[in-house]
Each structure stands twice: as structure tokens, then as C-alpha cells.
Regions:
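Acidic/glycine-enriched connector segments
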Residues: 1-184
Length: 184
């Protein structure tokens, strides 16, 4: 039996996007459509497992898309690696509800760190990157890095020489970066 092809999905923090947390904004809706399209293309190309670090931005969007696809593709898997068990405790109620629905519907849940561990979100990103064959990231490389977990995770993926598929959040363009080439 062939080893399943795994794709980690991540993105910049929602506040780095022009629309922030406003998922009703047309730009956010278009981004979600592009993300869904790229996930479906990856499925057609043989990706059968998607891994998320359970963040309340791109990770949640991707998980909801994959869970939706799983209703008709029972071989598709969503693997959720939470930074720690109480991650969503302080989230807004509407996000918390979606988070728990995501976890209820996923294939696997695993907490990466103990509650209170420093850099838990970064550790969760590193975990999914280590397990993945490639990384799908919603990321604007033209914005200066802030030192966030997301910035560090993308740099980590590059350092691990993972193939990257980048979606620009505003332009909705994609860029494929092979593991054999320099990402810059």
C-alpha cells in the first residue's frame, strides 16, 4: 500500500489580512474560494491527508473545507494538531463553536504541548510541517515578518526543504516552490 500524501495547511494571522476577522468581506470569501480550489486540486493530484494546527484563521478555514469534502470522499483525512488542550478557551464564542465542530468531524486530534507551554502554536505548526510532504500556505511574502509563530513556521518549512504552494491573500495568485529550489 502506498504511503498517503500529506499536506500541512497554514497561513498568516487574520489581522495580517486587509479584512482582519471579517469573514463576510468579499476579499475573505474569495480567499476561501481559492483555498478550496487549491485543496481540491491537491486532492486530484493525490493528497489524501490534510494537517492543520487548529488556528482560528487559515487553519480553521481549511479544516472546514476539508471536512466538507470528506462528506463525499471518505478516504480524505483531516488531522488536527492543537497547540494544547485549552487552546480555544478565550476565543470568541462563534469561533469556539466552529473550532469544536472542526474537532468533532476530523479524523484525528492530538495536542502537541501541555497547557502553558511557551511557543505552543509554533510547535503545532512545526509538528504538521514535519509530518507533511508539502505545505499549502496563505501568505503575503511582501509584508515584513513580525516574528509571529506563522512567520517562523513558514521559515521552518523552507529550512526543512518542504515543497510550498503559496496563495497570496489579496491577489489570490499562487506560487509553487519546489523543495529543490530556493524559496526566495
Amino acid at each position: 500500500m502506498d504511503k498517503p500524501v500529506c499536506c500541512a495547511v497554514m497561513g498568516q494571522h487574520p489581522l495580517r489580512f486587509p479584512w482582519g476577522f471579517d469573514e463576510e468581506d468579499d476579499r475573505c470569501r474569495k480567499l476561501k474560494m481559492e483555498l478550496a480550489q487549491q485543496i481540491m486540486v491537491l486532492c486530484q493530484e493525490g493528497v489524501s491527508q490534510f494537517l492543520v494546527a487548529c488556528d482560528y484563521g487559515v487553519g480553521l478555514y481549511a479544516a472546514e473545507i476539508v471536512n466538507g469534502l470528506r462528506t463525499t470522499d471518505h478516504d480524505l483525512m483531516l488531522l488536527c494538531y492543537t497547540p494544547h488542550e485549552e487552546q480555544a478557551t478565550k476565543w470568541a464564542p462563534y469561533l469556539r463553536e466552529r473550532y469544536f465542530t472542526m474537532l468533532e468531524k476530523c479524523t484525528l486530534i492530538s495536542a502537541v504541548c501541555e497547557v502553558g507551554a511557551p511557543d505552543a502554536q509554533l510547535h503545532a505548526y512545526k509538528k504538521i510541517i514535519d509530518l507533511a510532504d508539502m505545505v499549502l500556505a496563505v501568505y503575503d511574502r511582501d509584508t515584513p515578518p513580525t516574528g509571529s509563530a506563522e512567520d517562523k513556521a513558514l521559515a521552518y518549512a523552507e529550512g526543512q526543504r518542504k515543497s510550498l504552494l503559496l496563495i497570496h491573500p489579496a491577489e489570490l495568485t499562487t506560487k509553487q516552490i519546489s523543495a529543490a529550489h530556493d524559496a526566495r
